[in-house]
Amino acid sequence: MTTNTVSRKVAWLRVVTLAVAAFIFNTTEFVPVGLLSDIAQSFHMQTAQVGIMLTIYAWVVALMSLPFMLMTSQVERRKLLICLFVVFIASHVLSFLSWSFTVLVISRIGVAFAHAIFWSITASLAIRMAPAGKRAQALSLIATGTALAMVLGLPLGRIVGQYFGWRMTFFAIGIGALITLLCLIKLLPLLPSEHSGSLKSLPLLFRRPALMSIYLLTVVVVTAHYTAYSYIEPFVQNIAGFSANFATALLLLLGGAGIIGSVIFGKLGNQYASTLVSTAIALLLVCLALLLPAANSEIHLGVLSIFWGIAMMIIGLGMQVKVLALAPDATDVAMALFSGIFNIGIGAGALVGNQVSLHWSMSMIGYVGAVPAFAALIWSIIIFRRWPVTLEEQTQ
């Protein structure tokens, strides 16, 4: 049974299942941002020291995305999803049992291995299973799962960590992953690998200047975002001087705004992806530059977080659309590279935020993040004028 012979309802149900999986994976990626203080207290460490866990996770994903994708390029996709979920669940059990920070980091590396494969195939699978003419909407739905991880997963994980301990947060994610795995087994058809590419695809992709320019833009803008975002929880409490509950509410606002960004992109992304992305980068730049000035008011921080969340969702979606449009003949290789490069940016941003917090002042993370954001804005304007491309231009 192929995705072309099923009803639109079933096709959408499969995309929704992938969106739920995206929610699970992004919850576990984002949730340490809201648990840094609790984990640091548990292991008698500084918050900034624990933050290095974010960089390790992201750079493992970056390093392994392409090798794992190539190793599994001929594996049937349903089977591959099941296997990576098993690794994902087992790693969360180890996170729950972690008796030292080192063991916790090892467990997170296991999660990162599963993450590396998942995000290299998910976008292309969503497009493949979507009803005809609904590819942008399918991507938007996957992104909504990502946004919900921030609006629900991250704050809920933080609340669970506050009241039951951070270990229970990881245990709960593991249980959620198990339920999602059972749904995947029931709902997904056999999905033979296609358009996955191989090592032979790499020279071809590297000879596409538009694609390489998108990759460069991705790493710079993601570095800018995560320089500040990685430490937003301790920033709100230690620099702004607001309560832990407000920090949770702020994360809720930022994530919820991502859903707004997803809706905007779903409606306008096909025709105006380039304009949307450049505008969103400009908005990110403003938010980062105003982070410290806004720290004197809960209302100011709340409004800022809404625009910040909208900007990052549009940026993330726009980058995916352009990568898929520029590499329709090797989508999995291109997306594995994208996932790796995105995580290089996450790790770099978390590391920059770590170093700024340890050796300068955590109050400066917004200003420091604004520097690469400005560079990203200029670069986006240059490349989108030279290589305009929309999802409609994909090879069918």
Swiss-Prot record:
The keyword Transcription is assigned to this record: no
PROSITE patterns to which the protein is assigned, alphabetical: MFS
Main location: membrane
Tagged with keyword Iron-sulfur: no
Gene Ontology molecular function: any one: carbohydrate transmembrane transporter activity
Function: Involved in the efflux of sugars. The physiological role may be the reduction of the intracellular concentration of toxic sugars or sugar metabolites.
Family (UniProt): Belongs to the major facilitator superfamily. SotB (TC 2.A.1.2) family.
Entry protein name: Probable sugar efflux transporter
Organism: Escherichia coli (strain SMS-3-5 / SECEC)
